[in-house]
């Protein structure tokens, strides 16, 4: 399944419109991220007591965990307007000047994908965040003149899925930073129960648990699966989403008990069935499943790594014992006759998400 598939954390424009009706409006309604909610609540209450805008907020974490919802909640809790834009939409410094000078006092500016903002615009943002001022340059060369323009006090909420790409000067200007983590199954079940109530879906407790367990720790995926399961319940069942109904529905959509889709399983089956569990190079593995290496690396591998089904080593990709177990197979011995378990424990592993100079490491591999 492609990056925009059923268990992808990315959201289409149509889905974003649908999500608007499910978003929580207050920190109390927001499920999960307990520490982040508590920290935000204290900061917002303190700012309101002082009668000043709160510090600028940076929210990081994988897509689909609620960064946009929290930005909306911040504005709602402060009872101020919210203006939304994104890093890719700001191509020139002038684009940002137009936005900043139009802000009303206390307004919240939400800048999604802030790591993708153009460098000239980012540099202009520094003074706006610190001094509520922007310097507009008129002319070029030695005769250029800087005209300072005041900006109404505001709160910037930046969101990023790749905080490592933020420059130090930009990151340092945020007074509050928080990282959103993946959700536990019980938290996702609460998200699903709330969404089912808003959508008018009859969802049993075990049905919610079943969908939650296949949602990859991501509320956006959970809500997407709920919509598909609802369709199945209405068309082929009695309209009630039970555990059995959820299982039958998600079987049709090729989402298994761990939340793996067609591509995920194809990668695992190739790694285990064709290459004996590895190690095997990325290019060889991608060719074996008929996908581009970038697709395997960016779409399938992140969740397989997080689920403990695949690891990256200096010799290539290797299937873990859990991968064999998930496929209903026994771990095989490596060419030296050892079991897979010592191989995993003795291999020097890079941190999850690291890139390795491996390829052509399996016999016959590319």
Swiss-Prot record:
<dbReference type="GO" id="GO:0000400">
    <property type="term" value="F:four-way junction DNA binding"/>
</dbReference>
<keyword id="KW-0963">Cytoplasm</keyword>
<dbReference type="GO" id="GO:0016887">
    <property type="term" value="F:ATP hydrolysis activity"/>
</dbReference>
<feature type="binding site">
    <location>
        <position position="312"/>
    </location>
    <ligand>
        <name>DNA</name>
    </ligand>
</feature>
<dbReference type="GO" id="GO:0048476">
    <property type="term" value="C:Holliday junction resolvase complex"/>
</dbReference>
<keyword id="KW-0547">Nucleotide-binding</keyword>
<feature type="binding site">
    <location>
        <begin position="130"/>
        <end position="132"/>
    </location>
    <ligand>
        <name>ATP</name>
    </ligand>
</feature>
<dbReference type="Pfam" id="PF05496">
    <property type="entry name" value="RuvB_N"/>
</dbReference>
<keyword id="KW-0238">DNA-binding</keyword>
<feature type="binding site">
    <location>
        <position position="67"/>
    </location>
    <ligand>
        <name>ATP</name>
    </ligand>
</feature>
<dbReference type="InterPro" id="IPR036388">
    <property type="entry name" value="WH-like_DNA-bd_sf"/>
</dbReference>
<feature type="binding site">
    <location>
        <position position="23"/>
    </location>
    <ligand>
        <name>ATP</name>
    </ligand>
</feature>
<dbReference type="GO" id="GO:0009378">
    <property type="term" value="F:four-way junction helicase activity"/>
</dbReference>
<dbReference type="InterPro" id="IPR008824">
    <property type="entry name" value="RuvB-like_N"/>
</dbReference>
<dbReference type="Pfam" id="PF05491">
    <property type="entry name" value="RuvB_C"/>
</dbReference>
<feature type="binding site">
    <location>
        <position position="69"/>
    </location>
    <ligand>
        <name>ATP</name>
    </ligand>
</feature>
<feature type="region of interest" description="Head domain (RuvB-H)">
    <location>
        <begin position="257"/>
        <end position="366"/>
    </location>
</feature>
<feature type="region of interest" description="Large ATPase domain (RuvB-L)">
    <location>
        <begin position="3"/>
        <end position="183"/>
    </location>
</feature>
<dbReference type="GO" id="GO:0005524">
    <property type="term" value="F:ATP binding"/>
</dbReference>
<dbReference type="GO" id="GO:0006281">
    <property type="term" value="P:DNA repair"/>
</dbReference>
<keyword id="KW-0233">DNA recombination</keyword>
<protein>
    <recommendedName>
        <fullName>Holliday junction branch migration complex subunit RuvB</fullName>
        <ecNumber>3.6.4.-</ecNumber>
    </recommendedName>
</protein>
<comment type="similarity">
    <text>Belongs to the RuvB family.</text>
</comment>
<dbReference type="InterPro" id="IPR003593">
    <property type="entry name" value="AAA+_ATPase"/>
</dbReference>
<feature type="binding site">
    <location>
        <position position="220"/>
    </location>
    <ligand>
        <name>ATP</name>
    </ligand>
</feature>
<keyword id="KW-0378">Hydrolase</keyword>
<feature type="binding site">
    <location>
        <position position="64"/>
    </location>
    <ligand>
        <name>ATP</name>
    </ligand>
</feature>
<keyword id="KW-0234">DNA repair</keyword>
<dbReference type="GO" id="GO:0006310">
    <property type="term" value="P:DNA recombination"/>
</dbReference>
<comment type="function">
    <text>The RuvA-RuvB-RuvC complex processes Holliday junction (HJ) DNA during genetic recombination and DNA repair, while the RuvA-RuvB complex plays an important role in the rescue of blocked DNA replication forks via replication fork reversal (RFR). RuvA specifically binds to HJ cruciform DNA, conferring on it an open structure. The RuvB hexamer acts as an ATP-dependent pump, pulling dsDNA into and through the RuvAB complex. RuvB forms 2 homohexamers on either side of HJ DNA bound by 1 or 2 RuvA tetramers; 4 subunits per hexamer contact DNA at a time.</text>
</comment>
<dbReference type="InterPro" id="IPR008823">
    <property type="entry name" value="RuvB_C"/>
</dbReference>
<keyword id="KW-0227">DNA damage</keyword>
<feature type="binding site">
    <location>
        <position position="317"/>
    </location>
    <ligand>
        <name>DNA</name>
    </ligand>
</feature>
<dbReference type="Pfam" id="PF17864">
    <property type="entry name" value="AAA_lid_4"/>
</dbReference>
<dbReference type="InterPro" id="IPR036390">
    <property type="entry name" value="WH_DNA-bd_sf"/>
</dbReference>
<feature type="binding site">
    <location>
        <position position="183"/>
    </location>
    <ligand>
        <name>ATP</name>
    </ligand>
</feature>
<keyword id="KW-0067">ATP-binding</keyword>
<dbReference type="GO" id="GO:0005737">
    <property type="term" value="C:cytoplasm"/>
</dbReference>
<feature type="binding site">
    <location>
        <position position="22"/>
    </location>
    <ligand>
        <name>ATP</name>
    </ligand>
</feature>
<feature type="binding site">
    <location>
        <position position="68"/>
    </location>
    <ligand>
        <name>ATP</name>
    </ligand>
</feature>
<feature type="binding site">
    <location>
        <position position="173"/>
    </location>
    <ligand>
        <name>ATP</name>
    </ligand>
</feature>
<dbReference type="InterPro" id="IPR041445">
    <property type="entry name" value="AAA_lid_4"/>
</dbReference>
């Amino acid at each position: 399944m492609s990056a925009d598939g059923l268990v992808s954390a990315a959201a289409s424009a149509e889905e974003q419109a649908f999500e608007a009706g499910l978003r929580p409006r207050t920190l109390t309604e927001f499920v999960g991220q307990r520490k982040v909610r508590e920290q935000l609540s204290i900061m917002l209450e303190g700012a309101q007591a002082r009668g000043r805008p709160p510090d600028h907020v940076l929210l990081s974490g994988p897509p689909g965990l609620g960064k946009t919802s929290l930005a909306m909640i911040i504005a709602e809790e402060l009872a101020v307007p919210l203006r939304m834009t994104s890093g890719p939409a700001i191509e020139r410094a002038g684009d940002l000047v137009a936005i900043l000078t139009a802000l009303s006092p206390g307004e919240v500016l939400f800048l999604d994908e802030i790591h993708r903002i153009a460098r000239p615009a980012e540099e202009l943002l520094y003074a706006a965040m610190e001094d509520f001022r922007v310097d507009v340059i008129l002319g070029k060369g030695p005769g250029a003149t800087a005209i300072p323009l005041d900006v109404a006090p505001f709160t910037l909420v930046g969101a990023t899925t790749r905080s490592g790409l933020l420059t130090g000067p930009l990151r340092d200007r945020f007074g509050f930073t928080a990282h959103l983590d993946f959700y536990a199954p019980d938290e996702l079940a609460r998200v699903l129960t709330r969404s089912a109530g808003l959508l008018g879906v009859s969802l049993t407790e075990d049905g919610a648990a079943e969908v939650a367990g296949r949602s990859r720790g991501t509320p956006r995926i959970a809500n997407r699966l709920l919509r598909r399961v609802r369709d199945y319940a209405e068309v082929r069942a009695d309209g009630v989403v039970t555990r059995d109904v959820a299982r039958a529905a998600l079987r049709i959509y090729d989402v298994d008990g761990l939340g793996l889709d067609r591509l995920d399983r194809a990668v695992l089956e190739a790694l285990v069935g064709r290459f004996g569990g590895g190690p095997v190079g990325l290019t060889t593995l991608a060719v074996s499943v008929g996908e581009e290496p970038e697709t395997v690396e960016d779409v399938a591998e992140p969740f397989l790594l997080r689920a403990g089904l695949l690891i990256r080593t200096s010799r290539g990709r290797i299937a873990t014992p859990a991968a064999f177990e998930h496929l209903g197979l026994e771990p095989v011995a490596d060419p030296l006759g050892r079991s897979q378990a010592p191989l995993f424990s003795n291999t020097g592993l890079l941190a999850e998400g690291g890139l390795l100079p491996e390829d052509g490491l399996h016999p016959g591999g590319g």
